[in-house]
Amino acid sequence: MSFRSIVRDVRDSFGSLSRRSFEVTLAGLSGLTGHHRGKSQSTVHELCDADLIIQESRWASLPPELLRDVIRRLEASESTWPSRKDVVSCAAVCKAWREMCKEIVLSPEFCGKLTFPLSLKQPGPRDGMIQCFIKRDKSKSTYHLYLCLSTAVLADSGKFLLSAKRHRKTTCTEYVISMDADNISRSSSTYIGKLRSNFLGTKFIIYDTQPSYNGAVIPPVGRSSRRFNSKKVSPKMPSGSYNIAQVTYELNVLGTRGPRRMHCVMHSIPASSVEPGGIVPGQPEQIVPRAFEESFRSTTSFSKSSIMDRSMDFSSSRDFSSARFSDIAGGTINGDEEGQNKERPLVLRNKAPRWHEQLQCWCLNFRGRVTIASVKNFQLIAAPAQPPAGAPTPSQPAPPEQDKIILQFGKVAKDMFTMDYRYPLSAFQAFAICLSSFDTKLACE
């Protein structure tokens, strides 16, 4: 039997298993009356569990060598979507298959592929970029992120990844980010984060539903966590709102010609991640918290700037008053000696464009991925680390790692934009940064 036949048999067994379980449940529930209700219900569960055990043991009993060969061949052959869904199906067979898939299917950082939902919060590939595009619907104030499946972006249906919905408020604008294309709300189980702006649209904070662990030891669920089991939740600690990045656009009060200038402080990514041998520590094991209490666990971070009011009152304006643009440009927000001795967060800045005399416009080399000039277009690179006070300024040019484009975003058609990202950003982080470019910015152009 070929490995394709095995995969087909596995997928077919899912459907028959679901139908049999449903039929057994209906048959048992139809006879539930009086004092026999509890006994009949337990019998139904026993039948379903037995059926599940039989089906799972059938596939779990495969020799590990054969299973490894099947998964490895499938991983190599089904490298693109939509055929890559077969790899996801194999991971859902049973625990043994799932563990084997975790062993063979690498993260996007090393394989350059988006396979599981968890891949959306893992760093992109070190070599090359993952090409995506964003569709905007102005009438619904929604934005949908798709994975490119072909080089023809305008004719590409794409593989859906994430969605966002804009909510305008009196003093700010919020973009709710979800894994569901239609149900885009904070109350949904597919909600994974949000983007929030200040009144002028010059500063944005990216919030994640999970804290950035950063290799820190997570304290056990104690008294401070158990108190959230009650109906009264502290208003100063919203569920699943962890500040992981801040995007700042420089004010253009003089109205001079030129593109926007922006900086991104990635609190969950150390500056050393873009250096040779650098890594992004504390990558999540699941895309949403396992339990409600985990959304409230506090963690140690790189520096004082990476905490940034984890438990804050969203009705106040403290979100954006703790940092000046000049501080962000230098790569740190708190300039004290203690903060400089610790690991600094990664700072991204937009690559400076060049003025084209014939076209009379500012130009960036998007290598054909952007075709329409727009003030929203940008390319982000790593900002060089600022030397400590009193240290001599290095005269040698920046290392090649500093010149690599980490994220690029640009317009290709009406309400259609391309988004290409690479390590150390994840798809979620890149999407949130690009959403900030859509927002109206007073005194920035």
From Swiss-Prot:
Coiled coil: none annotated. Ubiquitous. Pfam families: F-box-like, Tub. Residues 56-102 form the F-box domain. It comes from the Eukaryota. Gene3D superfamilies: 1.20.1280.50, Tubby Protein, Chain A. Belongs to the TUB family. This is Tubby-like F-box protein 8. It comes from Oryza sativa subsp. japonica (Rice). The lineage of its organism: Eukaryota, Viridiplantae, Streptophyta, Embryophyta, Tracheophyta. The gene is TULP8.
